[in-house]
Amino acid sequence: MNSSHQSKRLIVLVGSPRRDGNSATLAQAIMAGAAEAGTDASLFFLDDYINGFLVDERHATPPADRYGELFLEHFLPAGAAVFCTPLYWYGMSAQTKAFFDRSFSYYSSAYPDAEQVHQRMSGKRIGLAVASEETYPGAAMGIVHQIQEFSRYSHSEFVGLVHGAGNSRGEISRDPRNPLQAARELGREIFTRPYSDYRMDTPRSPQVWQN
């Protein structure tokens, strides 16, 4: 499945409580890159929309928050999504994880429009930006694997990863690996970056990069 049926809208989701922290700084760089490409992009802080976790809706009502608005009105219509999260205990933040967990309320068979939700969840271009205190390359692999498997499960394309290091607010700008430039490029190229994920029977050219 490809993303040809999706719009060219980008949604950037920040799973940090800090509006001026390193995850938010990465998100702003992604937004700047999207603006350079003329991409319609919107940024959302997850804790403005999520204030509770997934519940057993057979016996309890969902949290009275704005998650449904975020998921149905902003995430589903977007053709691309970039998740920006700090590294907490070698995983994504609780806000970010709750975004995925809460979606079950809308794609489970109990939801009247579940089939439509399935279709609109699929075929997106997915990116990930992680801010951590550690420069250890393996620190973020748990998050990377989760986003990779979400993309696979939803027939989406995981097209880019940015991992930057910083502790104090904005310190990520001093990371010599220049993650802010990488984030800017991810935002600029979210709909154009080449993507390949071969299987044994995938038709392919003998060249990766065409002239």
Tell me the role of every PLM-derived stretch.
Residues 160-165:
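Beta-strand-loop-alpha "switch" segments that mediate conformational coupling across diverse proteins
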Residues 112-159:
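Short, glycine-/small-residue-rich phosphate/pyrophosphate-handling segment
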Residues 1-108, 112-113, 173, 177, ...:
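N-terminal beta1-alpha1-beta2 submodule of the flavodoxin-like/Rossmannoid cofactor-binding fold
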Residues 17-20, 133-137, 167-170:
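Short histidine/acidic/glycine/proline-rich micro-motifs that form metal-
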Residues 12-13, 64, 129, 133, ...:
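A short, mixed-charge helix-start or loop-turn motif at secondary-structure junctions
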